[in-house]
Amino acid sequence: MKSINRRGFLKKSAVATAGLMVNAPAIKKGFAKNSPNETINVAVVGIRSRGGIYGGGGHYGNFCKIPNVRVTAVCDVDERLFPKAVDEVEKLGGNRPKTVADFRELLEDKDIDAVSIATPDHWHALMTIWACQVGKDVYVEKPVSYCLAEGRKMVQAARKYNRVVQAGTQSRSSRLVQEAVKFLQDGKLGDIYMGRGIVYRYRGNIGYTKDSPIPKGVNWNLFLGPAPYRPFNESRFSYNWHWYWDTSTTEFGNNGVHLMDKVRWGMNKRVHPVKIQCMGGFFAQDSDQEVPNIQTAAFKYEDGVIMECEIRSLFTNSEHDSKEGVFFYASEGWAYLGGREFQTYLGKGRKEEPGPTISYKDLAPVESEIKGVDPHYINFIDCVRSRRWQNLNADILEGHMSTAMMHLGNIAYRTGRTLTFNPYSERFIDDDDANSYLTREYRQPYAVPNEV
């Protein structure tokens, strides 16, 4: 593909302040690297978090273990993180990646095939759109967007530029979840009338943090990006950015997306709800936190079925011995899907009895499995090679649909009333106040373009 110089790209990206798209360079025909022996070069963006499979450390930790995949760059606004990340990539993959503070520099590198985004939520859309425009594939963490309108533009960009864009809803690649969904969609529990997701994860008190000088090596302006400018604050910069409205999608977006993605998939719902209610608040703590730590939402669909999502970030009881999982309620009984087991209980016309159970321990390995690698990353790389975005386990459209549910819940919470939504236009009906939350005021020049 044709390259563009940094000064040229930065100038073009500034044009986005007027709502114009960043001009994408021409994309080579026959981009596919179909041979498994051809190397796919990946850049990982956002490397502060190293745990699990969701943070940047988890991203490069997985990609480095896939044959003929090389992490050639790591990017973060905090340059203090580079030495450890470079050492870890070298240990895992055998090469020392270059380090980049400004994501836009990666867009000029014609040797990078894909970018993997593990940044705070408010950067996901713009990075994804920019990457698509210059012909790079994208793996983007959940929630895929900061606001609902961004998600639709991400889908449009992926399709317009024929990009492979995988959402980081890793359960889509779980054999256990796949088998549970097949059971449900085959009608073995009967007609499902309600699904429910719970996230009861205790979050400590973040307290109060005063503004302070910007640390050496931190590009605070780039961290804020599309968000309003504020003086540097360590709490807003660390993991606690999750709890401030400028950068947060609440725990709904942080973890609710995972649960409701499984609920929506199990119930085979590929449309938005039409009625949304949400209540909650910030309880039992005294701190700078702006978003709720208790939140419950109900979503009603055109055919009358209901979905619910509840978060509790304080000490609380469990449901069915679980503090994180999904439940399905149907004409023949109910089911629970957790991280390790899918359990069914039959109840129609008889005493509640345990039905079929599926355990992850009982599932035979598949040929594509690689020890120590989450299959979601393998699926992404396979589709990058084949150019078949249709084979993604979590295509960006599915990521948008599940993330949008959580945005709708947050909007109902912030407006404080029941909302009526047009699932096809993706607008609230006769409600300018609610519609104002579908997008945001962007700080220039970090505006998501009106046309991608």
Give each language-model segment a name.
Residues 74, 85, 89-92, 148-151, ...:
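Active-site-proximal cap/loop segments of hydrolase catalytic domains
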Residues 179, 190-191, 196-250, 254-452:
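Contiguous beta-strand/loop segments that form the cofactor/metal-binding neighborhood of enzyme cores
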Residues 68-70, 111, 188-191, 272:
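Glycine-centered tight turns that cap/initiate beta-strands
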Residues 142:
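Short basic (Lys/Arg) and small-residue
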Residues 1-137, 149-164:
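N-terminal glycine-/serine-/threonine-rich beta1-alpha1-beta2 phosphate-ribose binding loop
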Residues 137, 145-222:
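A contiguous active-site-proximal alpha/beta segment in oxidoreductase catalytic domains
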Residues 4, 149, 175, 393-394:
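Residue-level signal for the nucleotide or nucleotide-sugar donor/cofactor binding architecture
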